[in-house]
Amino acid sequence: EMCIRDRANTKEIKTRIESVKDTRKITNAMYLIASTKLRKARNDLDRTRPYFEALRTEIKRIFRTQNDVDSRYFYPPEGEPPLEGTYACLVITADKGLAGAYNQNVIKEAMHMLDEHPDTKLYVVGEYGRHFFTQHNIPMEHSFLYTAQNPTMQRAREICDILLEGYDRGDFKKIFVIYTDMENSLTSSAHCTRLLPFHRAYFQTDTVEKAVTTPFEFVPS
């Protein structure tokens, strides 16, 4: 009887060892996949950053050379009444919840905005965000069905078109985006950034640049 029991225990131990080995293989495979996706995301970010910085520089040049910009896409000059009204917020989350605080921090920023401005219209990218707001009976103005993990220019244009149409109609006075900023491979943080209207303070730097004398024409005005 003792021998039978010992054999059973030995077999159970071997089974557990094999199970641990299989789990380790799966974990290593998941790690390799995650590392590959992280490198791709980093490369995509590095490729798009020059375009972002160039656009930021052009907007800064406009503010530096045009003191009184009369456009609905620019914040009113100092001394004029501030913009009041409904906000629009583009909330970008992942499709899955296995991402640590990645999604929770974005949701926390979105809930903070809703606490401050309850009439904010939500535009949501990512299954995690859609599920959270639906589960908590928080209305969404629009939820985009494609994944945030596979962004394309076409999808970005579709989002921009919907937001700009609402902005031009006067459905909301300001557009914000809540997203995760990748500081390095180990650190990321949620940010809330206003997209429209542009504000002079957002583009002020200590860098001295050559003045531009060519007049600007805004289309649409």
Question: What would you call each of these model-derived segments?
Answer:
Residues R5-S221:
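C-terminal beta-strand-loop-alpha-helix "lid" module of Rossmann-like NAD(P)-dependent dehydrogenases
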